[in-house]
């Protein structure tokens, strides 16, 4: 069981923060049942993920795409059209007009016989 350090992986993924995201993604994949590309050697999933990155048995680009896909709140549909920009700008214009309109008086005036 060899020790894996960040320095072993930095030449493959230069940004340490990206390395953490990619290793965490790969560790989640392994926990979910993905096949490991190296022997486990009694290591836990995050260590296995770092070892895979260090030994270049997994592509960081593939992990990066998986990270982006998992972080997306709205997945694009295949039948989406590009004319939605027009409707968005129309909605923004309608909101601007509504916001600039004078407010109605909602106070209860002398007409109220309470």
From Swiss-Prot:
What is the role of the protein in this entry?
A: Promotes RNA polymerase assembly. Latches the N- and C-terminal regions of the beta' subunit thereby facilitating its interaction with the beta and alpha subunits.
Its family remark reads: Belongs to the RNA polymerase subunit omega family.
User: InterPro entries, alphabetically?
Assistant: DNA-dir_RNA_pol_omega (IPR003716), Pol_omega/Rpo6/RPB6 (IPR006110), RPB6/omega-like_sf (IPR036161)
> Which of UniProt's keywords are assigned here?
DNA-directed RNA polymerase, Nucleotidyltransferase, Transcription, Transferase
What cellular component terms from Gene Ontology apply here? DNA-directed RNA polymerase complex
GO MF annotations for this entry? DNA binding; DNA-directed RNA polymerase activity
* NCBIfam families per record: rpoZ
Which BP terms does GO give this entry?
Answer: DNA-templated transcription
Enzyme type, top EC level:
transferase
So which domain of life are we looking at? Answer: Bacteria
Tell me if Transcription regulation is a UniProt keyword of this record: no
User: Which is one Pfam family of this protein?
Assistant: RNA_pol_Rpb6
Q: Which reaction does it catalyse?
A: RNA(n) + a ribonucleoside 5'-triphosphate = RNA(n+1) + diphosphate
Quaternary structure, from the entry: The RNAP catalytic core consists of 2 alpha, 1 beta, 1 beta' and 1 omega subunit. When a sigma factor is associated with the core the holoenzyme is formed, which can initiate transcription.
- Species in which this protein is naturally found: Erythrobacter litoralis (strain HTCC2594)
Q: What is this protein called?
A: DNA-directed RNA polymerase subunit omega
Cystine crosslinks: none
Entry's EC annotation: 2.7.7.6
